[in-house]
Amino acid sequence: MHSLLVLFVSLLALGALKKHLDFRAAVDKIHNYPGLRFIFGVQSFIFGKRIPYFAAGGLSLWDTKHQDFVDHDADIISSVNIFPTCATYMIADAQAIKEITTNRARFPKPLQQYKILTFFGSNIVVTEADEWKRHRKISAPSFSERNNRLVWDETINIVKELSDDVWRGKNEVTMDNIVDLTVPIALFVIGVAGFGRRMSWVEDFTVPAGHSMPFKDALHLVSNHLWMKVLLPAWFLRSAPIPRVRKFHTAYEDLEKYMIEMIQARKTAEKKEERYDLFSSLLDANEEETDGNTKLSDSELMGNIFIYLIAGHETTAHTLAFTFILLALYQDEQEKLYQHIKSVVPDDRLPAYEEMGKLTYCYAMLLETLRMFPPVNLIPKQAAEDTTLHTSNMAGEPVAVPCLAGTALAIHTPGLHYNPRYWEDPFAFKPARFLGDWPRDAFLPFSAGPRSCLGRRFSETEAVAVLTYIVARWRIDVKEEPQFAGETFEQRKARLLDSKSAITLYPVRAPLVFKRR
């Protein structure tokens, strides 16, 4: 027994020594560049909040925003942890970020971190170099002006049905959590403009042969509970003793069947109907491709449309939620937006797609929300060759950052968006800052460079359409709750904007009231 104990302690000591040496090697690789040191890095999801020197915390990037850079006197800092053992440069310098995002060969995406997004098949997000170009050649044409018009028209139809039918006869509607409104709106839009499947606010009980649930329900369950597919093994999903997990697995398999059927129906149709939803456009572009080496397989087609689903649904739903919260908190800004909308779209008529360019304050409102609440807090990259990054300290003096090949890089979106070097009074909600000239290189909600989000215009069109229609007809207020009576404005703001991050950043709970104008 004593010998086993000695062996166990010896192995433990050897493991600890190896980890210590690996940690020192990681620190030496970056020449002990100033920054943060932890036992557990941000990759350790067990720890949400930061514990100094112990755990970086999964939410630390959002919680600290630009403060870590101020504390270490530069807009590029290091972060080194033991579990997993790695050193990363965190970057909130706009020029350094521009250099990284515009040079794909020198600063590629670390593909191993994206493998979890290959559920249905390889796609544009999880590929690099020539393979990425192949996916982009087929995918990019789907995001056309005709698709943008479809997004606008269908979004207006969806919120009009909500206002005229679902909320008919009601002068006041209470949402206990605003995401309960914005998530279905975004879901319906991606359903029709993404998949060509029009959905309704009315419950659908029709289940096609060979399926377990309607398309709408399968899409809703998969998009809302994708974390299960990310975190849980396939064998557990299939036989989990938890009904909610099994239901997700059924929905996932059903959605896959729906997509396969849609592909086959489009391929075998004698006369192809001219349609501009993303899936139909993607299939058409693939069919028209004459180079057999460029064509996407069925699994790659599904992989790409799945990425559109997640990116489009999550990002827009949560951005709209944050925008409604900010409008409820800042009534003066809501009034400015209302007056602006009425000046562009008078007489209670429906807003037209051609008027989107005139809705400048509505667009500014959206951009300011995205600045303050970027969907993704971190964009990972890596150095493919030895190089030097350049930044400056808080006094404006130049700082050179040695960067060896293989070094991990992380574009720190909240650090950039709250950097006072680029944004005056960064914690203030000021949509007007986007009406004139503004620092475009310091704004990264959709990434930047050649790999920036293809669906940016899709998301912006949907969001502006929703805001234009709803704000013109409904005033948004905070729901008064007795347990929060007497709270200050800052306390109320902190409560309503309390956020967590899963696939994207989202508000925890924000009860709002919509009052008919």
Curated annotation (Swiss-Prot):
SUPFAM superfamilies per the UniProt record, alphabetical: Cytochrome P450
Co-factor(s): heme
Pathway assigned in UniProt: Secondary metabolite biosynthesis
Pfam families, A to Z: p450
Localization: Membrane
EC number: 1.-.-.-
Coiled-coil positions: none
Xref: Gene3D superfamilies: Cytochrome P450 (1.10.630.10)
Domain of life: Eukaryota
Broad EC category: oxidoreductase
Binding site for heme: 453
Keywords tagged on the record: Heme, Iron, Membrane, Metal-binding, Monooxygenase, Oxidoreductase, Transmembrane, Transmembrane helix
InterPro entries cross-referenced by the UniProt entry: Cyt_P450, Cyt_P450_CS, Cyt_P450_E_grp-I, Cyt_P450_sf, Cytochrome_P450_monoxygenase
A molecular function (GO) term: heme binding
Physiological role: Cytochrome P450 monooxygenase that is able to use trans-stilbene as a substrate for oxidation.
Family, similarity comment: Belongs to the cytochrome P450 family.
PANTHER family in the cross-refs: CYTOCHROME P450, CYTOCHROME P450 12A4, MITOCHONDRIAL-RELATED
Protein name: Cytochrome P450 monooxygenase 124
Species the sequence originates in: Postia placenta (strain ATCC 44394 / Madison 698-R)
